């Protein structure tokens, strides 16, 4: 029973589906046929509506030429106006009853033709050509104002450069001081004139103390100094005191002399000096002088100072060497 019922349901469903398909196909076919039938009517209605709209517009604008072309049915009138048709679209439109009253409107195109020819003959240009006598008359007064203008123009031109020259005059003294700084390097030539100099060093005790005379005497003798002229010590070319003196040692306290018996002697320091030029090589003598000062300072517990009694520096030593070279070059 279940199988029979299922088979019946399948058959009924298939029949229903086929019926639906046939019904849909038939309805679509019917709609298409009705659309094709209604199209020519719609086209005719649309054409009529367009023609009626064009006629209304033409009536509003009052165009005479279009009305003439569309109203004429006679062959004689058609031949006269065929050449003047501006738009071929009106030939295919059927004449309607509304176009019949356009016949009396043929007068406006005829009235338009005469005004076109009327402006052509009117040429008043020939009359001013016949006036040659008036042209030379204005030329003569034109020459007269030209001459005073030319004469007045150069007057301000000459007056303008005069203040310009005055402006350049104060500029001249500005250029004058320029050669003045050129003369400044002239004093540089004074350096070669130095043909002699004195190199000074000091060996001093520390601040608030003094050098012991006995230690000072031993250190001076070890450095090669010998007591001699002016009651001071001298360093000669040879350690035994023979030969010329290279540099000398004096007391820092005035009058700068020494007493050979210096056991009970004290002093804040001693001064070593060398006169340039001297015997032999001055630079080598300067090195020997510096070594002697350092030896004495180490022995007595003092320090080496420059000529200003300041701590000796490498820059000051180079300055001493430059002075020695300068004096040597001046004495060549």
Swiss-Prot record:
Its main location: membrane. It is a single-pass type I membrane protein. Residues 51-63 have a biased composition (Acidic residues). It is found in: Cell inner membrane. It holds the Pfam family ZipA_C. SUPFAM superfamilies: Cell-division protein ZipA, C-terminal domain. Residues 1-6 are periplasmic. GO terms for biological process: division septum assembly; FtsZ-dependent cytokinesis. The keyword Ligase does not apply. Keywords: Cell cycle, Cell division, Cell inner membrane, Cell membrane, Membrane, Transmembrane, Transmembrane helix. Residues 99-115, 123-150, 160-175 have a biased composition (Low complexity). Residues 28-332 are cytoplasmic. The chain crosses the membrane at residues 7-27. Residues 42-192 are annotated as: Disordered. Belongs to the ZipA family. PANTHER family: CELL DIVISION PROTEIN ZIPA. Interacts with FtsZ via their C-terminal domains. Essential cell division protein that stabilizes the FtsZ protofilaments by cross-linking them and that serves as a cytoplasmic membrane anchor for the Z ring. Also required for the recruitment to the septal ring of downstream cell division proteins. This is Cell division protein ZipA. It comes from Escherichia coli O6:K15:H31 (strain 536 / UPEC). The gene is zipA.
């Amino acid at each position: 029973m279940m199988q029979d019922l299922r088979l019946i349901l399948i058959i009924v469903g298939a029949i229903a589906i086929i019926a639906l398909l046939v019904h849909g196909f038939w309805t679509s076919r019917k709609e298409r046929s009705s659309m094709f039938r209604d199209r020519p009517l719609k086209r005719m209605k649309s054409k009529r509506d367009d023609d009626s709209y064009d006629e209304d517009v033409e009536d509003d604008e009052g165009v005479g030429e279009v009305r003439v072309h569309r109203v004429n049915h006679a062959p004689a009138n058609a031949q006269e106006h065929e050449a003047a048709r501006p738009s071929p679209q009106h030939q295919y439109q059927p004449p309607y009853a509304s176009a019949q009253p356009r016949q009396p409107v043929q007068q406006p195109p005829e009235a338009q033709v005469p005004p076109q020819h009327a402006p052509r003959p009117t040429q008043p240009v020939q009359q001013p050509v016949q006036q040659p006598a008036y042209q030379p008359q204005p030329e003569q007064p034109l020459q007269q104002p030209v001459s005073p203008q030319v004469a007045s123009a150069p007057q301000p031109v000459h007056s303008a450069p005069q203040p310009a020259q005055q402006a350049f005059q104060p500029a001249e003294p500005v250029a004058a001081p320029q050669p003045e700084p050129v003369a400044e390097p002239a004093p540089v030539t004074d350096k070669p004139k130095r043909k002699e100099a004195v190199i000074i060093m000091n060996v001093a005790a520390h601040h608030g103390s003094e050098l012991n005379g006995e230690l000072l005497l031993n250190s001076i003798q070890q450095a090669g100094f010998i007591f001699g002229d002016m009651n001071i010590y001298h360093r000669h070319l040879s350690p035994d005191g023979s030969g010329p003196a290279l540099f000398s040692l004096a007391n820092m306290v005035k009058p700068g002399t020494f007493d050979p018996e210096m056991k009970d002697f004290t002093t804040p320091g001693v001064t070593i000096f060398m006169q340039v030029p001297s015997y032999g090589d001055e630079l080598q003598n300067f090195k020997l002088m510096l070594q002697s000062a350092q030896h004495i300072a180490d022995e007595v517990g003092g320090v080496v100072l420059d000529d200003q009694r300041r701590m000796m520096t490498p820059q000051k030593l180079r300055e001493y060497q430059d002075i020695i070279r300068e004096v040597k070059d001046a004495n060549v």
